Amino acid sequence: MFAVHLMAFYFSKLKEDQIKKVDRFLYHMRLSDDTLLDIMRRFRAEMEKGLAKDTNPTAAVKMLPTFVRAIPDGSENGEFLSLDLGGSKFRVLKVQVAEEGKRHVQMESQFYPTPNEIIRGNGTELFEYVADCLADFMKTKDLKHKKLPLGLTFSFPCRQTKLEEGVLLSWTKKFKARGVQDTDVVSRLTKAMRRHKDMDVDILALVNDTVGTMMTCAYDDPYCEVGVIIGTGTNACYMEDMSNIDLVEGDEGRMCINTEWGAFGDDGALEDIRTEFDRELDLGSLNPGKQLFEKMISGLYLGELVRLILLKMAKAGLLFGGEKSSALHTKGKIETRHVAAMEKYKEGLANTREILVDLGLEPSEADCIAVQHVCTIVSFRSANLCAAALAAILTRLRENKKVERLRTTVGMDGTLYKIHPQYPKRLHKVVRKLVPSCDVRFLLSESGSTKGAAMVTAVASRVQAQRKQIDRVLALFQLTREQLVDVQAKMRAELEYGLKKKSHGLATVRMLPTYVCGLPDGTEKGKFLALDLGGTNFRVLLVKIRSGRRSVRMYNKIFAIPLEIMQGTGEELFDHIVQCIADFLDYMGLKGASLPLGFTFSFPCRQMSIDKGTLIGWTKGFKATDCEGEDVVDMLREAIKRRNEFDLDIVAVVNDTVGTMMTCGYEDPNCEIGLIAGTGSNMCYMEDMRNIEMVEGGEGKMCINTEWGGFGDNGCIDDIWTRYDTEVDEGSLNPGKQRYEKMTSGMYLGEIVRQILIDLTKQGLLFRGQISERLRTRGIFETKFLSQIESDRLALLQVRRILQQLGLDSTCEDSIVVKEVCGAVSRRAAQLCGAGLAAIVEKRREDQGLEHLRITVGVDGTLYKLHPHFSRILQETVKELAPRCDVTFMLSEDGSGKGAALITAVAKRLQQAQKEN
């Protein structure tokens, strides 16, 4: 028993001594946690350098865009071919991707050798050889009669400008075929395939083996957004935000970046951790000074590193009693498979002895222990370096997503990772230590990167088909110049129709006289009350105007109008308004005051004078009973009487559009048009009295409230009316009415978007084909969400957050489509508004007999003010359709309430002038 203990002690002491000896000798190969964190930081900096346009040309880590923009979503199906060229043999596959939802893949494959004379010979011969092998495979599998898409896995650094193209930057590993560098490998292979007249194959995608690995794993796990290969060579790819990729135009969505991390350190960034053995290995390689990171990591080099170390130790008398065999002097005699065998847990020492004996050496027990530890240090350093670079990628992903914890999957492949008994465990452990804020799953790519190339091709086919479907829907909202000119002409005709006495009663564009006959001239003065009713909020204002200084001071208070009041009785609505006025007067210390009042009433009214307005019909969600056909000024007066607390002199009832024009007209006498683009949509303008047949008198001008929201109610714009507009119209409070407003105003745009999203989801193009309860809910898409989603400053991640707030769980690709839909709907709205406005400015130019008209438009409304693109598109449309009109757009900063007070002040001024005359 004692002897056994003695032997165990002796062996353990021997092992300890040998390990210490090797540790001392290879001190520089052992990397501390601090060193790994430093390498991680350096790699982050190299990634940034590679992504930036200015620094990419000199970057060692090239960060190549792959033009792979989406990962599989499970809806892919069909038959695809795949080629994998990049190692000691290449593979051809036929991949059958199952019908939707089943995520099942069937594969048939065949390996072909890549002889040295082919991979180091002439480039044309290489591609002809590959094409011959593909033809052989198709003949064997009876595929010659089929037209099939093909994905090419090409495991060498390529610069791509599209998915189906790749210019070889440099050969790596053992490949050295002449005349291929700086040429498009897809074109070269396509040309070689043309020699086979009976083969009909389209190369749809060129991918790196790393990208193929990521796509293979992503088919099984949608969280997979990183691919890593640790085999003959080493590389990594990951999904980067487009907004960070300077080399590719556009900032929507994500794209897979092939890091080509094997070249990390080629610019000297890793000199402090490279050892004499790394330098010696590099000098003896096919590409000295290149792929320095790869030479410290990959399977092509680990065995050689071990050989160089053993040779040096033997020369120093630290191994084999100082004896060296000719095999130990021979390059390539120790391979990575030997390193893996020597590190096996139980039989490792026995394997070590056997391998060393095969090398012509006579190892002692101590030698075997030492050699095994050399292998451990070399392979552990490899895993550590890989872990540091991968941790940098994971940190970048987490920061891109702006999350505290990242959940992600890394697709893994490569012979070193697969065959080495300790490698995966070591890599995983170090990664988790370096990035504790990331929950990482490592998924082995069972089918290799070739299946991934087929998956990229399948995704490309799916995306192509889906893109066509989405484009068909969006095309309905893309108006041509001819269509806009047609809308302009029809609006012009409807304006004329509404002005004529004979046709006025039947006109859909009402062209209502407002009896506002003058603009402010700067002499107005006094205190005025103004009411502003037109949306879910109601404002009461006290406006103080000072003569001669164009100075206005305003005090206002906003009151809510509950839905039950909006849709209750007329008496309840006006009693609520008077209650709000009483509260305001009390608040301002004006209880019992008698002041002139202007009433901004943003609904279509027929007026017989400036202080009389008969409601034609409610819009914007109001439905109060017993109001339509009644004079709203009388209804307000009666409500004031019922309260019997104060008396007000109601001087003017005006539309919000007129109020907007007057507010801007106070600042700019050239302002003769008012436009509201908000909850509703409307326009007013100063018309020559001679053209207004419903009002007597031919001198001067009068403001006409067009009520253009009703344009199209007679079917004149049915050619641009879509099925989605019909859905929105039928679900509205006033079906068949206000059709132009329903295509252009903030109240309806979000609802049009929702209808499109439902349709696209039904077609399986969005939200994984699942229509959530939230998406079925009318009104969830408020215009403010459209404005936020379309903001240029908003990254897709924030768009996804907005959609999540709306209860819609979207992918990155979904977010892009939602943004496109919002853009198409709001663009059409702005263009239609622009076409309508162009009709009015052209009419004013022609009426005045001018070659060129200069005019100002006063504008208000949340859509115009808050939407990031609406105002620009509207202005561009007006410029294009009315080139002889110089139109200035002036934002009404104080809303239509100030305008009502100004109209009241102007009316008072004109009344006073009449009295004096």
Swiss-Prot record:
Binding residues for D-glucose 6-phosphate 2: 532-536, 656, 679, 860-862, 896
Subcellular location per the Swiss-Prot or TrEMBL entry: Cytoplasm; Mitochondrion membrane; Photoreceptor inner segment
Membrane topology recorded in Swiss-Prot or TrEMBL: Peripheral membrane protein
Top-tier EC class: transferase
Keyword Membrane appears in the UniProt entry: yes
EC number of the protein: 2.7.1.1
Stretches assigned to coiled coil: none
InterPro entries linked to this entry: ATPase_NBD (IPR043129), Hexokinase (IPR001312), Hexokinase_BS (IPR019807), Hexokinase_C (IPR022673), Hexokinase_N (IPR022672)
Expression tissues: Widely expressed. Highly expressed in the brush border, surface epithelium and the myenteric plexus of the small and large intestines; the acinar centrocytes and interlobular ducts of the pancreas; and the alveolar macrophages in the lungs (at protein level). Present at moderate level in the thyroid follicular epithelium (at protein level).
Sorted UniProt keywords: ATP-binding, Cytoplasm, Glycolysis, Kinase, Membrane, Mitochondrion, Nucleotide-binding, Repeat, Retinitis pigmentosa, Transferase
UniProt entry tagged with the keyword Isomerase: no
Residues noted as binding D-glucose 6-phosphate 1 in the record, renumbered to the chain: 84-91, 209, 232, 413-415, 449
Chain sites annotated for binding ATP 1: 30, 84-89, 425-426
Superkingdom of the organism of origin: Eukaryota
Gene3D superfamilies: 3.30.420.40, 3.40.367.20
Cross-referenced PANTHER family: HEXOKINASE, HEXOKINASE HKDC1
Family: Belongs to the hexokinase family.
Entry's disease: Retinitis pigmentosa 92: A form of retinitis pigmentosa, a retinal dystrophy belonging to the group of pigmentary retinopathies. Retinitis pigmentosa is characterized by retinal pigment deposits visible on fundus examination and primary loss of rod photoreceptor cells followed by secondary loss of cone photoreceptors. Patients typically have night vision blindness and loss of midperipheral visual field. RP92 is an autosomal recessive, mild form with onset of night blindness and vision loss in the third to sixth decades of life.
Free-text function comment from the UniProt entry: Catalyzes the phosphorylation of hexose to hexose 6-phosphate, although at very low level compared to other hexokinases. Has low glucose phosphorylating activity compared to other hexokinases. Involved in glucose homeostasis and hepatic lipid accumulation. Required to maintain whole-body glucose homeostasis during pregnancy; however additional evidences are required to confirm this role.
Protein name: Hexokinase HKDC1
